C-alpha cells in the first residue's frame, strides 16, 4: 500500500442460524459468499480490497473435510478478486459455525466515496438487478419445509438457477469500480445493497441530509425474480426494496456526468436527490407519491 493512499477496513460476521442455514448452503459457497460480502463494502467506498483475515468458531459437528471445503470457497473468492489472506484465527464453540472476515483495502484520498456526499439534483443509480437473492432464499426455505415433511422428496429447484446463485454465490461489483476509474468518474455518494434498496437509500439520505424521489417503474428486476415473486404472492417491488443481499452498488452522481453512464447496461437511473424537506418518496407506477418505508435487515431481530 502506497503511503499516499488511505486504508479502508471493513468487518462482517456470519452466524449459522442467523445469516445462513446449513440445510441448503454448500460450505464452499458459504466460504465464497463470506468473502464477497466483505469485499463489497470496500468497493462501496470506491476503494480496492487487497487483503483479508479469516476467523472461525467451529463446533464439533464439523469435520476437517468440511473446514477444508469452506476454505476452498474462501480461496476461490480471493483468487478471483486478487486478494491475499494475511491471517486470522480458529477456535471451537459449543454449537454451529461463525465466520468473521475483515477486509483491508486502499484508495487515494481524493477518490474515496462516502455515504454523505449526495447533493440536490444528483442522479440516483443502481447496478444490476434487485430482489433476486431474497426470492432465491424464499425458494430454498420452501423446499426445506417440503423436505422436512417428506425427506424422500427431491427439491424442486428447476427454473430457479439465477435467483439461487444470487442467494448462495453472489458477486461483488469490482467491474463497476474499474469502470469509474477508466471513465474518470466519481460518485458523490455510494453504498452496497446488503439490507435492501429502501434501507440503503435511507442511509445515504440521512448521512447526506437530503431527500429523494425513487421511481417504482425504474427499479431493475430480473424476469425470474419477478415471476417467482408473483408465484409467492409477494409484490416484486417489495422484494427489490426490502429483500437485501443483492450486493449491488447504489450511488449518486452529478447530472453533468450523465453522458459517461448513458446507455451502460450495468446501471439504471432509478430516481434523483431532492431537498431534505421534500422527504424520501416512492413514485408508484400510477404516478402517486408516498413516503418510502425501509424494512430491511434488523441485526437485533432473529
Predicted regions and their residues:
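Helix-biased detector of long, well-ordered alpha-helical tracts
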Residues: 1-302
Amino acid at each position: 500500500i502506497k503511503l499516499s493512499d488511505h486504508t479502508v477496513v471493513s468487518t462482517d460476521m456470519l452466524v449459522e442460524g442467523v445469516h445462513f442455514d446449513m440445510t441448503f448452503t454448500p460450505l464452499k459457497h458459504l466460504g465464497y459468499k463470506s468473502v464477497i460480502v466483505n469485499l463489497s463494502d470496500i468497493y462501496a467506498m470506491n476503494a480496492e480490497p487487497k487483503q483479508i483475515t479469516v476467523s472461525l468458531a467451529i463446533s464439533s459437528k464439523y469435520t476437517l473435510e468440511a473446514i477444508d471445503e469452506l476454505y476452498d470457497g474462501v480461496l476461490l473468492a480471493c483468487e478471483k478478486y486478487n486478494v491475499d489472506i494475511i491471517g486470522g484465527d480458529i477456535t471451537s464453540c459449543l454449537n454451529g459455525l461463525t465466520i468473521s472476515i475483515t477486509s483491508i483495502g486502499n484508495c487515494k484520498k481524493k477518490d474515496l466515496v462516502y455515504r454523505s456526499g449526495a447533493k440536490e439534483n444528483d442522479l440516483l443509480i443502481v447496478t444490476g438487478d434487485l430482489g433476486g437473492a431474497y426470492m432465491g432464499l424464499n425458494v430454498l426455505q420452501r423446499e426445506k419445509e417440503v423436505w422436512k415433511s417428506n425427506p424422500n422428496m427431491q427439491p424442486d429447484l428447476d427454473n430457479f438457477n439465477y435467483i439461487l446463485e444470487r442467494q448462495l454465490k453472489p458477486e461483488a461489483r469490482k467491474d463497476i469500480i474499474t469502470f469509474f476509474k477508466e471513465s474518470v468518474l466519481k460518485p458523490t455518494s455510494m453504498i452496497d445493497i446488503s439490507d435492501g434498496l429502501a434501507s440503503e437509500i435511507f442511509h445515504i439520505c440521512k448521512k447526506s441530509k437530503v431527500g429523494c424521489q425513487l421511481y417504482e417503474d425504474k427499479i431493475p428486476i430480473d424476469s425470474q425474480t419477478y415471476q417467482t415473486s408473483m408465484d409467492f404472492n409477494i409484490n416484486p417491488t417489495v422484494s427489490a426494496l426490502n429483500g437485501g443481499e443483492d450486493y449491488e452498488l447504489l450511488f449518486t452522481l452529478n447530472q453533468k456526468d450523465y453522458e459517461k453512464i448513458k446507455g451502460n447496461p450495468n446501471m439504471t437511473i432509478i430516481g434523483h436527490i431532492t431537498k431534505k424537506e421534500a422527504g424520501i418518496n416512492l413514485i408508484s407506477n400510477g404516478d402517486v407519491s408516498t413516503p418510502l418505508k425501509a424494512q430491511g435487515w434488523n441485526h437485533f431481530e432473529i
